[in-house]
């Protein structure tokens, strides 16, 4: 089957970079930088759609469901990147936010031929995850037409699940299939068809919003502090102390003692200090308020 790439916005030539191979290095980079500046602005009109996805994901996570990203190539890698950052940043379990890439683990590091064209495999990869209507699927493809992702979307719909997409082609087949389509138009790439550039940047910005927004909604952030951060290295151990100090305006010794007493759980330590409670009392209060610090403090 032939594909008319000229119809895809992401495959058109960019007049602003037509002579980029003749420019000095600084001028070449200036063109790239100027093109990149369009990306954030292209996302702005889609904030209502992104908000809808955030709220759907938050509701799914509260109910025991999952956020599943699926894509091929750069798009798939971006989903995996966002998913992999959720456990250390927000203390989620690895299975709560999952990234799937066409071609599996090998495709993370190198290109795997033809896998993005396998529609049946997209559905099969969701089946292998026991995907259900409790989960949210976010399909990722710059072109908006990747068969692998479309297969996954169709399977998700067959399970009556909520399906969103992040693409840079508002007229692609994926946009027609999605419950919510987030399709910022970033224009042709500096290097024709190289969607790891502006399209990839746009997808990354949107994924940042989806995961971060959902985590804020389910209580993983207090003020602007990542209060469920896990202490998996020296930097994060120090960050925990800093977070408790910032949240409670206490001294270092008080923050350290509270963290030591509660098994290094920032939320518990914060409630201990602010409400003058023991570790057990703070843990119980947080549990009664679904892990939301503000709700817990208002009910002391």
Curated annotation (Swiss-Prot):
Gene3D superfamilies: 1.10.8.1080, Glucose-6-phosphate isomerase like protein, domain 1. Induction: Induced by MurNAc 6-phosphate that releases the repressor MurR from the DNA. Repressed by MurR in the absence of MurNAc 6-phosphate. Its EC number is 4.2.1.126. The keyword Coiled coil does not apply. It comes from the Bacteria. GO terms for molecular function: carbohydrate derivative binding; carbon-oxygen lyase activity; ether hydrolase activity. It is an enzyme of class 4 (lyase). Pathway: Amino-sugar metabolism; 1,6-anhydro-N-acetylmuramate degradation; Amino-sugar metabolism; N-acetylmuramate degradation; Cell wall biogenesis; peptidoglycan recycling. Residues 57-220 form the SIS domain. A lyase-type mechanism (elimination/hydration) is suggested for the cleavage of the lactyl ether bond of MurNAc 6-phosphate, with the formation of an alpha,beta-unsaturated aldehyde intermediate with (E)-stereochemistry, followed by the syn addition of water to give product. Belongs to the GCKR-like family. MurNAc-6-P etherase subfamily. Specifically catalyzes the cleavage of the D-lactyl ether substituent of MurNAc 6-phosphate, producing GlcNAc 6-phosphate and D-lactate. Together with AnmK, is also required for the utilization of anhydro-N-acetylmuramic acid (anhMurNAc) either imported from the medium or derived from its own cell wall murein, and thus plays a role in cell wall recycling. This is N-acetylmuramic acid 6-phosphate etherase. It comes from Klebsiella aerogenes. The lineage of its organism: Bacteria, Pseudomonadati, Pseudomonadota, Gammaproteobacteria, Enterobacterales.
